[in-house]
UniProtKB/Swiss-Prot annotation:
Homodimeric cytokine expressed predominantly by T-lymphocytes and NK cells that plays an important role in the survival, differentiation, and chemotaxis of eosinophils. Also acts on activated and resting B-cells to induce immunoglobulin production, growth, and differentiation. Mechanistically, exerts its biological effects through a receptor composed of IL5RA subunit and the cytokine receptor common subunit beta/CSF2RB. Its main location: secreted. One of its GO terms (molecular function) is cytokine activity. This is Interleukin-5. Residues 1-19 form the signal peptide. The gene is IL5. It comes from Felis catus (Cat). Homodimer; disulfide-linked. Interacts with IL5RA. Interacts with CSF2RB. InterPro entries: 4_helix_cytokine-like_core, IL-5. One of its GO terms (cellular component) is extracellular space. It holds the Pfam family IL5. One of its GO terms (biological process) is positive regulation of podosome assembly. Belongs to the IL-5 family. Keywords: Cytokine, Disulfide bond, Glycoprotein, Growth factor, Secreted, Signal.
């Protein structure tokens, strides 16, 4: 019996470790994009004279359109080349993913109970994951 318990715990630990090691394709894309951004930061800054509107709000989820407008401005003012092509391609893929996710915001009509359940989860996310400003 004790051996069975040890084997079960060992299997559970192995499953946990393998679940941590597996990242979603979007997580890998974002990680790669962050690395590319860090690598090419100096090239993107250039002479430092380009002015791009930057949101003041700390809740990045609320400023997605402004962020991607800034990316478009940066892309249009950056000399094309192999060095930054992958970065802008990745950013484009991230935007496409976000746009697909936003299409899921429109939903069917359901009874009020289902909406209230959704609202409760939504408020929980705001309470725990968003930076609250005064």
């Amino acid at each position: 019996m004790r051996m069975l318990l040890h084997l079960s715990l060992l299997a559970l630990g192995a499953a946990y470790v393998s679940a941590i090691a597996v990242q979603s394709p979007m997580n890998r894309l974002v990680a790669e994009t962050l690395a590319l951004l860090s690598t090419h930061r100096t090239l993107l800054i250039g002479d430092g004279n380009l002015m791009i509107p930057t949101p003041e709000h700390n809740n990045h989820q609320l400023c997605i359109e402004e962020v991607f407008q800034g990316i478009d401005t940066l892309k249009n003012r950056t000399v094309p080349g192999d060095a930054v092509e992958k970065l802008f391609r990745n950013l484009s893929l991230i935007k496409e993913h976000i746009d697909r996710q936003k299409k899921k915001c429109g939903g069917e009509r359901w009874r009020v109970k289902k909406f209230l359940d959704y609202l409760q989860v939504f408020l929980g996310v705001i309470n725990t994951e968003w930076t609250m400003e005064s």
